[in-house]
């Protein structure tokens, strides 16, 4: 099986056909023409200043509340390193992004996973944990089209989560890189925009709406916290990548970002629908929540299918998936995360057929 023949539902990245390469070329040319000195210099740890101001305007905050970083994972790392010490309690969703688990565990944090359902994190379960004595430093939440579950946190639960954070004294880390990629329903307000108690730090990225290669993300939060992180960033790398950030800035101010979001959302909406239909047709025992946006669909397979056994069989049949157990401290043995962002529509049904064939072989 060659790389060209492999159908991969593994990587959460857009396929090249939905990346606005020409728009990026034009943005790069404008950036070099407009501000050659600014974009080729070291810059400051808060990021490329015009982009910082644009992000502040997008979120309705002061520029002092924004730091631009080398991708959202860098933003995550800055916040985790600033807030979490060995032994500190941290709440995350169950399931959650695998690198979140890894990074928090590497810091020595005591990670508590709280059940996630079709409406997001179970706030009643979280309240029970808090009332039992848990005092976390932060709760890491992916509110829109969550990675890996694909679900969206309901408006009611967003309100409750904000109330719990204020009542029990923890920060909400609203990790929101997928928010703009909605292809069904109406958008919900961010918890950042709803916050009246300074309990939210918001992160996002241009990886999903522009392209992964730009490596531009950001944090928005209380000015004092952002200033403290910026000082640490100065010692770490002086400044993030000014060239990438200047290109992203031109991509945004020209309106290309809006066209890119529309293109990506339309393409991924079609892929998500085709994937859901294919699963219903070829794996009738599977259950899942069809996402309203984002990159991912989480599938619970029948209990007689162990994904540790399925994974190598699927690989031999030319389809790559990610095991649900990668996103959990325990469990996930019968679940898969399927990323539909990098597969084209004409690959999806064949990919699901291969998964179904692998399931049949595991059962045989």
Where are these regions (language model features)?
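Short hydrophobic/aromatic beta-strand micro-patches
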Residues: 220, 298-300, 339-341
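Conserved core of the PLP fold type I
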Residues: 38-168, 180-197, 268, 346, ...
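Glycine-centered flexible beta-alpha turn that most often forms the glycine-rich phosphate-binding loop
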Residues: 175
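PLP-dependent enzyme catalytic core of the Aspartate aminotransferase-like
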Residues: 316-317, 329-364
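Active-site PLP attachment segment
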Residues: 192-228, 240-243
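Structural signature of PLP-dependent enzymes
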Residues: 40, 229-234, 254-276
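Conserved glycine-rich beta-strand-loop-beta hairpin in the small C-terminal domain of fold type I
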Residues: 249, 266-276, 287-300, 313
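N-terminal "arm"/small-domain region of PLP-dependent enzymes with the aminotransferase-like
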Residues: 1-45, 57, 170, 316-319, ...
């Amino acid at each position: 099986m060659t790389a060209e023949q492999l159908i991969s539902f593994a990587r959460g990245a857009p396929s090249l056909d939905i990346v606005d390469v020409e728009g990026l070329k034009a943005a790069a040319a404008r950036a070099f023409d407009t501000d050659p000195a600014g974009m080729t210099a070291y810059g400051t740890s808060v990021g490329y200043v015009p982009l910082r101001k644009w992000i502040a305007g997008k979120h309705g905050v002061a520029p002092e509340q924004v730091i631009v970083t080398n991708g959202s994972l860098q933003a995550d790392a800055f916040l985790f390193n600033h807030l979490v010490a060995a032994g500190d309690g941290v709440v995350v969703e169950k399931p959650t992004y695998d690198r979140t688990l890894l990074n928090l565990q590497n810091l020595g944090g005591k990670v508590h996973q709280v059940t996630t359902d079709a409406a997001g994190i179970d706030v009643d379960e979280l309240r029970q944990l808090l009332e039992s004595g848990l005092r976390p430093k932060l709760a890491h939440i992916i509110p829109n089209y969550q990675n890996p579950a694909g679900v969206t946190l309901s408006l009611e639960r967003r309100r409750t989560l904000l109330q719990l954070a204020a009542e029990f004294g923890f920060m909400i880390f609203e990790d929101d890189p997928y928010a703009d990629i909605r292809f069904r329903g109406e958008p919900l307000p961010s918890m950042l925009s709803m916050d009246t108690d300074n309990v939210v730090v918001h992160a996002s990225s241009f990886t999903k709406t522009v392209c992964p290669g730009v490596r531009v993300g950001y944090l928005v939060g209380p000015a004092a916290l952002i200033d403290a992180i910026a000082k640490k960033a100065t010692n770490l790398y002086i400044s993030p990548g000014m060239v990438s950030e200047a290109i992203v800035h031109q991509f945004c101010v020209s309106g290309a970002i809006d066209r890119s979001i529309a293109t990506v959302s339309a393409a991924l909406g079609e892929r998500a629908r085709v994937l859901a239909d294919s699963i219903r047709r070829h794996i009738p025992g599977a259950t899942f929540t069809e996402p309203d946006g984002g990159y991912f669909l989480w599938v619970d397979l029948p209990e007689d299918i162990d994904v540790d056994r399925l994974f190598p069989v699927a690989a031999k049949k030319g389809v790559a998936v990610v095991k649900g157990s990668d996103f959990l401290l325990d469990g996930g043995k019968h679940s898969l995360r399927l990323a539909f962002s990098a597969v084209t529509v004409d690959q999806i049904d064949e990919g699901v057929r291969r998964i179904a064939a692998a399931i049949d072989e595991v059962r045989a």
